[in-house]
Structure formats: C-alpha cells, structure tokens
Amino acid sequence: MFQTLMNKDRSHIGKILFLGTFFLPVSSYAQYAWQEGAEAGKLDLGKDIHYEVEMQGSFSNDKTPLWLNANKYGLSSLEKNNGYLRGSVIRPLATDSAHRWGVGYGVDVAVPVNYTSHVVIQQAFMEARWLHGVLSIGSKQYPMELKNQTLSSGSQTLGINARPVPQVRLALPEYWTIPILHHWLHLKGHIAYGVMTDEKWQHDFTQRNSKYTDGLLYHSKAGFLKIGNEDVFFPLSLEMGLEMAVEFGGKPYRYVNGELVQIPTTGGLKGMWDAFIPGGEDATDGMYGNVAGNTLGSWMFRVNYDADTWALHFYGDHFFEDHSQLFFLDYDGYGEGDNWMGHTKRRYYRYKLKDIMLGTEVNIKYGTWLRNIVLEYLYTKYQSGPYNHDHTMNIPDHLAGMDGYYNHGIYPGWQHWGQVMGNPLYRSPIYNKNNQLYVYDNRFIAYHLGVDGSPSEHFDYRVLGTYQKGWGTYDAPFYKPHHNVSFLVEGAYKFKHNWKVRGAYAMDFGSEEMLGHNAGFQLTVSKSGLFKL
C-alpha cells in the first residue's frame, strides 16, 4: 500500500530495488545444495521418495487457540472441533546433491473436517536444480528466513501462517560463496510470481457484501548477504537482507456509493514489471501517483555467534508498507498556489524507526531438557505516525502516515484463505464476524517466549507463551487498549517404525476484540518412511 510517490521518487526506488534483486532467499537447508566433488552416479527419479500419513484432531471450548492454529502453513481451522487426514509423497532435491542436475517433486493432500475447504492440496510442486540455482513450479511450503521455524512468533512479510501460493520461483536458495574476498561474502535469494487460490473462499466469507478480489496475482522477491567465513575459526557472522511482496492485477471489487464496482488493474507483462520494480498506479489514486498494487516488505538482519557447545543469535525484522518506512524519508518540498505540484525546495520529512521485531535465540547444542530458547519483542504502533496528508494548493506539507499494516484500500490485504501471510499476532481476517477482509488489530506491542528440548531419544517438547497489548488500527481504533495472553504446551513421542504421536494443549486469555477466551487440545498421529521401489 505505497503512499503518494512522485515520479522522481519512484525512479530512485526502482533503481535501488532493481539492484537489490541481484542480491536475492528461500531456505537455508541443504536439501537444495550441490555438493561439489561428491561422487555422482546415475540420476534416479524413483530413488529416495519419502511418504508421510498423518491424522489430526483439535477439540476446543470455543475457537481453536492461537498456537494450535497459527504458523501451520494455513492447514488449520478456528472451528471448535476440527481435524484432517493427510498424506504426502515427496522426493527432496537433496537426493541429487552429488549431481550437477537435481530433480525434486511432491504432492501433499489433506481431507479435512470443519475447514474452509473439503479438500486441501497443500503442496503440489516440481523443481529442478542446476548447480546452485533452483527453478520451482507449484505450491510448496517455504520456511522463514533468519528465524527459528518452531519457536518464533513468525516473520512479518514472508511467514508460514497461510496456505502456500502456487508460483513459479527462481532461487539461489542456499548461500553461494562469492569466489573472491577469501570466502567472506555469501549471497542467496529468489524471485517468484504466482496466483492466489482463495477466490471462492472470499466470495463465501464476504458474501460479496464487502470488497474482494478475483484472480489476484502475487509477486515476491528477496535477497540476503552473509558476511562470515566458516572455513576459519571465526564464530561471528552477520546476515542482512530485504524481503518484498506485491499483490497486483486481478479483478478487485468494492462498494462505491452503494454499488459493487470492479476496479481496473494492470496485469500481464506490464503488471509483472510494475510489481518487480514498483511502478504504475492504481485506478483510485487520482492526481497523487502511488505505485500499483499492495506492496510491502521487511528489512531483516541476524547476528550469529557460533561456539563449540552453544550458539547465540540476535535478529531484527522491520516491516514497511510504503517508502516512509522503507527509506524513512518523504519528499516535502512542494510549492504553493499554481505551482503546488512542483518540487521547489530541497526538503524531506524524516520518519522514525520505531516499528520493529527484535529477537534473541540461544541454542544449547548438546542440551537435553533445554535445547533452544527464543525471546521476541514486537512493536507496530507507529506506522509512520497518526497523520496522512497529501499536499494541496493551500497546504504544501506532505505526510505519509497511518500506513495500515496488512490492509489495503483495493485488495483484500496481506492474507490468503483468511490467514495473514506474515506474523499471526496481526489478527487474521478469518476471526472477523462481520465478513470483512480486514486486519482489525495491527497496532500492538507483544512479548513472545519459546523453548524446546529432548529429554530422551524418543521424547521432545515445546512451550510457547505470548503477551500482547493491542490498540486496533488507525482507521478503526479500540476504544481502549485490549490485552491477550496465549500459551502452548506440546509433547511428541517417537515409536518404532517411524510412528509418532504428538499432543498439545493451548489457551488464549483475552478480550473479544483480540482472540477471546479459548482452551483446546490437539492430537496428531503420523507415520513416515521411504518407498522401496
């Protein structure tokens, strides 16, 4: 939701973001890597095919509690009693790590009860690797960057809270070492285009009585730079980068003067280019030129200290919805009177860096009862301030505040199938009883703690606890601040022959404006293994 952006400013942003795409993440897992020097052998596409069958049931007194519902790639439900039977067949790229070429594929399907769908195709993808580059086509669950996958509250831009978006994705998924500077610099990144799949769900949820979008298109890109050298004894490293995403094109509908109206948009190659290098404008922008679509992203960093028996990490995730928090500057040198659209002064307004997610992670490498600890702090109240004013003939001052995180005037906001696509502490639209595709709590302060351990070879556990204080949104503020506390206690036991049973209990304690009072239990039974062809 980029605020007013003049052509001069837009060109600067475009150049910077275009250069940034050359420092483009997906996952830091070795499943993608080509192991140079390994013995190759013959490529066998029927080798190392993994299967998993899983059955899950959730039982609650009201809605499913937050941490039984969130960060499950959208495979969850708020209904008090729900469940699914799930089966997957996946051949990972790691199978071909000794080859210059690699091939991976997978299908992951769930048949749920009391979900938003009768059948969920959670994953269906094919991917090919040449050396270090990977081309993927289809729906796939991609992990978060620079955060613990099971203990963090979630990433603010490219999270794991919503269903995967079918896409074509070109990636350098693992850090590639630049063959100069003595192996101290490493790069990874991705570019992707896709299509949202929740069109019918939007129709059902809104009953077409409020805004929705058909055929909504998706674009994401990211790039990370790592400074460090694992070949020498130097335990300190720094990772930093940028994630960006855009919702664009499609057929947005909203009510204007009581009538349902389709808003014209730009799709095709022009729309894809405007999403790649933010440009164009929405039909509703008028004389104040914005960029087309719903554009958002995060500046991210992570400092790592890796010792022999322990590791310490400190990370940050700064979210933005427009240039006011992307660059913290806004041009504010417009003229007056007949020259009110002219750039007459070298004057800029500087925004503060207040909204941020900060986290610390401790890994005890040989720990049993205590293995990993994550502590996070989130602040999202500022959003460039409580004022938004486009310059006029009489008042030349320009302020681009009230950013409205995860919401958008035309599009349904940063959500997919009702779940926000970033951090689940932003209250997802699926909670709304008024059938609006709107995030009603995006201004909050939160503290989050996660710990896990493996007391024995067969048993492991996880505990999450979150405190949140919310102010609603700038457009729809709460009449007073509201609070919520959520926690989860989970244990899993591994039996012989790759059988696993996992039980979890969770509760929410909060006002109805937040999550309400919920308590629930979740039981999951799974069996995994390899097909022997």
Question: Where in this protein do the model-derived segments appear?
Answer:
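Surface-exposed loop and membrane-interface regions of Gram-negative outer-membrane beta-barrel proteins
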Residues: 98-128, 142-161
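Bacterial Sec-dependent N-terminal signal peptides
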Residues: 1-35, 525, 529-533
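Transmembrane beta-barrel architecture of outer-membrane proteins
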Residues: 50-54, 80-88, 119-123, 165-169, ...
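Transmembrane beta-strands of outer-membrane beta-barrel pores
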Residues: 55-63, 91-93, 107-113, 130-132, ...
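Exposed, low-structure sequence patches enriched in small/polar residues
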Residues: 236-242, 252-533
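Short loop/turn motifs that connect adjacent beta-strands in outer-membrane beta-barrel proteins
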Residues: 34-50, 91-103, 116, 129-133, ...
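Transmembrane beta-strand segments of Gram-negative outer membrane beta-barrel proteins
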Residues: 32-83, 96-107, 189-193
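Internal, well-ordered domain-core segments that constitute the primary functional module
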Residues: 143-263
